[in-house]
Amino acid sequence: MMALSLEYQKYLIEKMRIYALFGGGISMENAKNRPPFRYDIVGSFLRPEALKEKRETFAAGKIAAEELKEAEDAAIRDLVAKEKEVGLKAVTDGEFRRRYWHLDFLAALEGIEEVGAEKWSVAFKGAQPKATTVKIVDKADFGDHPFIEHFRYLQSLAGDTLAKMTIPSPSMLHLICCVRATDYAPIKRYEDEARLYENIALAYQKAVRAFYEAGCRYLQLDDTSWGEFCDPEKRKAYEARGFDLDKIECAYVTMINRVLEAKPADMTITMHICRGNFRSTWFSSGGYEPVAEILFGGCHVDGFFLEYDSDRAGGFEPLKHIKDQRVVLGLVTSKTADLENKDDIKKRIEEAAKFVPLDQLCLTPQCGFSSTEEGNILTEDDQWKKLRLIREIAEEVWQ
């Protein structure tokens, strides 16, 4: 039998201590002040026009990187102040330094390269993002990654408020490079796909430790793979290409759980499941039934941020597979300016509570307001109205 490292032995001892104290659940009194919170956010915010202009001039080669960074720093400083003002218990940097919610992080991993593309890797139901993608060119690893410094700056602004960091789920690297890409051919190192899954998991374990050492205690994995696997049409298309989606789903859950082995006891890691969010449009539709048992029943994240702002997400019945995690209901859309009716949202929370105890439920926008630098079709004022509404509802439901 393989001997466990001293570091892993210490981790197991601490894990057992926490379970002895709290029974492994989230409903204990000591866990109530931990994220995700009763009213929370997914992560991205609309970029100010001044920042958009700076990014355009930088892309055109008219200003230096330092000038762009100064503009980003100022915009993030203003954003964090507004997040605190609206009463958020966890703040993000709005993803203001990114072009895309996922590709900037993935392309900065070792062994991963951003490349041009004829079209986006999945088709939206309307406007399409600027075409680019990533590919695996060498061993996937986490090295000197710029997102650690991004987090440190956010942490310096957060003060007594919790700083939340969002990154793409490890599933996204495999999905984009190996599933969506019709011309994928593994490099020699990864002809055995199990080795690829393991390397991605190990890279993300390093990421978890690096963020933790930088002070991060609230990390979110953003993931559109599950949204795609909920879509009947996409399932048929992938299966027609020879993919066994049940096998892939199990591999993804196993990989994510492997990543979570590196999570210290006082760190929260959640997952946001998305069906696409670009210029107020989407690319997937379908309830959670096809993935619920594998994902909700097997993935060990601390909470799930789930889209539920339209009938494209189906009903709440699949939530019966949830264990003791928190479920953050995305009942308020981030795609349009229309302000939801407070009573309607409360009724939907009551419906969800038939399948998950109310004490495990929270409320959030269905997605970020700007998953790419272009942003959804609403105003900054609209996004703050949405967050104030969410806080009001949460305070009335969970008094």
Locate each region found by the language model.
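Domain-level signal for soluble alpha/beta catalytic cores
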Residues: G24-Q399
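Methionine residue identity
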Residues: M1-M2, M16
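Short, Lys/Arg-enriched N-terminal segments with co-localized hydrophobic residues
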Residues: K10-S27
